[in-house]
Amino acid sequence: MLLCTIHLCSCGRYDCTFLARSEFGVRISVWRCPISKVAECFIDRFVEEHFYDSLDLNQFGNTKGRSTLTALILLTHTLFNYSDDSHNFVRVLFVDFSRAFELIDHTVLADKLSLYNFPPHLKLWMLSFLYGRSQFVKVGNNCSKIVNTHAGAPQGTRAGPSAFKIIINDLKLTLPTIKYVDDVSVVSVASDPGNLDLQNALHELYDWAILNGLTINTDKTKEMLIHFGKG
């Protein structure tokens, strides 16, 4: 990984690098082998075909035939169904995970690849793509030591979203949940705004995140309260 100053430009015009912003406000440029990018396209197709039947129906991210639009349609339809009763309060929790792709636990991923009966060659390819990576940081003329990474997926790869979808697939809460890769929306309805169903679901989500080596970003996790009453 290389940290350096980069002039921002259209990613559509210049596809040679992937740009991301670190938590320190520094632009991260990740250079990848062109052969690796081509190979990823083929492998990602096989991964999607194998995993499609096991994929959570409420997962809409990076999936053929599903999109942000279909996710919003489902959310709107869910809210509309609750609007018939003017006494209902609907609470929607929009959950964000901190550095989701960077914190992908390779051991957790290996266990879930086995859980979903991935063929050995696909499992080995995904794990070998992530295992044994090293990185260093360069700022100006100064370079850090080279260190090995034990978690995460390289930024801008197809493997990142695919691996995260596999990890989050078994996230099942007691309340309706809509997923878009690493973004999760949880919907609760009650006649009493002080109902604790959403809080209990949040505890479930927190426990699941700890078990899977992930962290909820409390700064970006927001709640929206909706009431259909008049006046």
Regions found by a protein language model. Name each.
Residues A209:
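Glycine-rich and small/hydrophobic secondary-structure elements
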Residues G140-C143, N200, T215-G231:
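Short, conserved micro-motifs composed of acidic
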Residues M1-P154, S188-V189:
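Conserved pre-catalytic core of RNA-dependent polymerases
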Residues A190-N200:
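Short helix/loop segment flanking the catalytic signature motif in cyclic-nucleotide metabolism enzymes
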Residues A71, V90, G160-I167, L198-A201:
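Hydrophobic alpha-helical membrane-association signature
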Residues V95, V181-D182:
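Active-site flanking residues adjacent to catalytic metal/cofactor-binding acidic residues
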Residues V92, I178-K179:
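Hydrophobic "anchor" residues on beta-strands that sit immediately upstream
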Residues V186-A190, H227:
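Short beta-strand-to-loop capping motifs
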